[in-house]
Amino acid sequence: MNQSVHQRMQELEQLLNRYNQEYYENDEPSVPDAEYDRLFRELKTLETEHPDLKSAQSPTMKVGGKPLGQFRSVEHEVPMLSLDNAFSVDEFEAFSKRVEQRLDTNQTVTFCCEPKLDGAAVSLLYENGLLVRGATRGDGQSGEDITENVKTIRNVPLKLSGDVPERLEVRGEVVMPLGAFERFNEQARQREEKVFANPRNAAAGSLRQLDSRITAKRPLHFYAYSLGLISETTQLPDSHHQRLLQLKDWGLPVNIEIKTVDSVQGCDDYYEAILARRDTLNYDIDGVVFKVDSIRLQQDLGFVARAPRWAIARKFPAQEQLTTITGVDFQVGRTGAITPVARLEPVNVGGVTVSNATLHNADEIERLGVRIGDCVSIRRAGDVIPQVVSVIKDKRPENTKAIEFPQHCPICQSDIERVEGEAVARCTGGLYCAAQRKEAIKHFASRKAMDIDGLGDKIVEQLVERDWIKSPADLYRLSKAELATLPRMGAKSAENLRNAIKATQETTLARFIYALGIREVGEATANALANHFKNLDALIAAESEQLQEVPDVGAVVAKHIVAFFHEAHNQQVVAELREFISWPEGEEASSVQSDRLSGNTYVITGTLSTMTRDEAKSALEALGAKVASSVSKKTTALVAGENAGSKLTKAQSLGLDILDENALAELLSD
């Protein structure tokens, strides 16, 4: 029995030592925190039950990882220890009772409560108010000198203000805010550079760059959470909470969520409140830290091998777990995007049973190297769709299967298109594909397209759900009697809607082209195509080179147009629509009355009082101008109404002309 137990303990030690190295030294953990915590607790339980088998080098006795050779080693004069964990209110209550028993007092113990930030722990040493050293936690006894890197973090003060101790060591966490993390990874993908699995890895990896100029480009943020070394002559409050507020007065950033409570119930209330707001915070947290607030009582309680007796981290339900991929489905979104979705052995992640997770796209499948049958790490945060974040390749069975991306849409069998430079593959059967049907018909009926008055989104959804319309052409086949059976419709409303649909049977070529919903073909491009080709058959027959002769049509837009009209299902729907809809052939499709502003590009922003923005747009286009949606160096002038925002700021920075309504009126009347 003892032999098998001892063997299991050795296995756990080897695994935990390896995972510690991956986490603390390589900044690339291969397993989620929940899996590490599970193994750690198993080893700790076995060591408690079999103390004679416990190794002196056990991971349960250590903190972090050893410093790397490329950084100068720094000794911590006051050890930087870890924290013990509680995974339930019962475990926290047991901790509270241990505190009371050790203090042997009936007085109320006040706790300081703080969010447990999921980043990289660092030490900042100030001498006479000046930052002289930054260091990682390392193994708790010694860390790595990262002074030049921490100096690049924007909210780390290089000089403290006020009457500060001669020597002051501040401990805290460096994180990468969630919004900044998403932007950083997206930019890295565009540059085809390494992306980070999570903000914690990004923060830790950024701090350990040998070139501080790289760290300076990373959006890092520091939060102070405790003191280490302090000059002996310094008089500070006995309260940990008050000391944090003192740090704030000296210019150090402190988390605004900290507070003190006087009971176990107060701690539980704080835990539940932060857990409820977890997904609204702009940084990752994996629990709450409770510390005995009195520094004197902290000293009385002391430490064990790797953690203080006066603090504990109550962990949140894990947002990452391990499970197995049993298969992959390919879903079609409302814009035709094909998304691979992994089917999983059900697993509880963050308190929710997860049986599916997104794999995003073909590039992500290749990057992960994931196969059907793999053991994978699943992450779920808030309302974000669960996703596969990594493959545990040392747990890969022999019978895994490659994931094959389809060539045809799984819904309508139309061709799948992937434009060079884009990660997303799309179904080309826009007007025909059932998965895209609702959005395609809503767009077809919209004001700037066919402008079917009274055909709102809810009615479109009802028509599609009843399977009455499979394509926009079916709108023209609807009877008044059918429409009258819809909820809250009635005979009169049905007649009005039927008449509104019939009224659109005479339109313009430009509106019809725009209504088809071809990717990247907006209102202005549809006008340009109609003006250039004069009739639909010429447009349908056009090849990429001919299309690129049209103003504002580049290679990518041309490819979308060709793909749309070459798709057999789209050809069928267009042919059906032409049975109902007509327009003047061979005429100018736009309402251009003059070329006085030809070659000029305007952008409209803010609220106009004498006309709508659409009316201003039409008036400018009637004089030959182009109206764009964003400001650039090519913009001739910005038309700015009331409450103009970022577009006005950008236009001013580029030195562009700014036109108010009076100037616009003069321009239009000249």
Curated annotation (Swiss-Prot):
It catalyses: NAD(+) + (deoxyribonucleotide)n-3'-hydroxyl + 5'-phospho-(deoxyribonucleotide)m = (deoxyribonucleotide)n+m + AMP + beta-nicotinamide D-nucleotide. Signal peptide: none annotated. It comes from the Bacteria. Residues 592-670 form the BRCT domain. InterPro entries: BRCT_dom, BRCT_dom_sf, DisA/LigA_HHH, DNA_ligase, DNA_ligase_AS, DNA_ligase_CS, DNAligase_adenylation, DNAligase_N. The active site is at K116. The keyword ATP-binding does not apply. One of its GO terms (cellular component) is cytosol. Keywords: DNA damage, DNA repair, DNA replication, Ligase, Magnesium, Manganese, Metal-binding, NAD, Zinc. Belongs to the NAD-dependent DNA ligase family. LigA subfamily. This is DNA ligase. It comes from Idiomarina loihiensis (strain ATCC BAA-735 / DSM 15497 / L2-TR).
